[in-house]
Swiss-Prot record:
GO terms for biological process: formation of cytoplasmic translation initiation complex; positive regulation of apoptotic process; regulation of translational initiation; translational initiation. It comes from Caenorhabditis elegans. Component of the eukaryotic translation initiation factor 3 (eIF-3) complex, which is involved in protein synthesis of a specialized repertoire of mRNAs and, together with other initiation factors, stimulates binding of mRNA and methionyl-tRNAi to the 40S ribosome. The eIF-3 complex specifically targets and initiates translation of a subset of mRNAs involved in cell proliferation. The gene is eif-3.K. Keywords: Cytoplasm, Initiation factor, Protein biosynthesis. GO terms for molecular function: ribosome binding; RNA binding; translation initiation factor activity. This is Eukaryotic translation initiation factor 3 subunit K. It is found in: Cytoplasm. Residues 41-221 form the PCI domain. PANTHER family: EUKARYOTIC TRANSLATION INITIATION FACTOR 3 SUBUNIT 11, EUKARYOTIC TRANSLATION INITIATION FACTOR 3 SUBUNIT K. GO terms for cellular component: cytoplasm; eukaryotic 43S preinitiation complex; eukaryotic 48S preinitiation complex; eukaryotic translation initiation factor 3 complex.
Length: 240
């Protein structure tokens, strides 16, 4: 069954008091799989199944949880990934595969796109630090490979970050932030975000952030009794 059909049926099934009916778990899991296969997303469904796993621990399926976490990473910079983590019981967090997703999430949330693309392309070299999060970096591309559209989602996320942090950016740097994207792909993404090509296309003008700053005046009304109390408290004592 397609994602659209599953989505429609589930939204009817989880409406009102039936939202956390444990009988919905199987259909919710099937819908999550459809999201993975068809590159779709529904926040309500992914958070509902995580809550049902909390309420019905005997139905817990880590494979589905991993899919949910990776899908929420695909909609950064929304807070869905953080919300999803909060709906996983602490006794489940020791899983090595879950930890790998959390570590990947930390890389993306910190906008460390250079590290992300090294991991994806097999160019990452783990450090000797005992706390090195990616001691087996080859597991990362295997983990995200089944997630249709994952790399494209990260590219769009990177462009959204660039839109609010850069005024202009060189095409070469933009290509690196997008994982070595071709000139054609870089130009297409730049156009989709409304960036203007400058200097024979070697630089993109992103936005004049200084020109869009909005000032805000905050007025606070102070009542006279408050002033009187303040003056009384600082008045020096009378000397006789």
């Amino acid at each position: 069954m397609s994602f659209e059909k599953l989505q429609k049926e589930l939204h009817e099934a989880i409406e009102g008091v039936n939202r956390y009916n444990p009988e919905n778990v199987a259909d919710l899991a099937a819908c999550v799989q459809a999201m993975v296969n068809e590159n779709k997303y529904d926040k309500d469904i992914v958070l509902t199944i995580l809550k049902l796993y909390q309420l019905n621990p005997e139905k817990y399926d880590e494979a589905v949880v991993r899919q949910v976490l990776l899908k929420t990473l695909m909609v950064l910079p929304s807070s869905d990934f953080a919300l999803a983590k909060c709906l996983i019981d602490t006794n489940r967090l020791g899983s090595q595969e879950l930890r790998r997703i959390f570590d990947l999430g930390a890389v993306l949330e910190s906008c460390n796109f250079a590290v992300f693309w090294k991991l994806v392309k097999g160019a990452y070299k783990p450090t000797t630090n005992p706390n090195e999060p990616f001691k087996v970096p080859g597991e990362v591309p295997k983990m995200i490979k089944p997630m249709v559209g994952f790399e494209d989602a990260v590219k769009h996320y990177a462009c959204r970050v660039i839109s609010v942090t850069f005024q202009k950016i060189e095409k070469k740097m933009l290509s690196r932030l997008l994982g070595g994207a071709s000139d054609k792909e870089v130009t297409a993404l730049a156009q989709s975000f409304g960036w203007e090509a400058k200097e024979n296309g070697d630089v993109f003008f992103v936005a004049n952030h200084e020109g869009t700053i909005k000032t805000r005046n905050i007025d606070e009304k102070i009542q006279f009794p408050h002033v009187a109390d303040l003056l009384t408290s600082i008045q020096p004592p009378l000397t006789l």
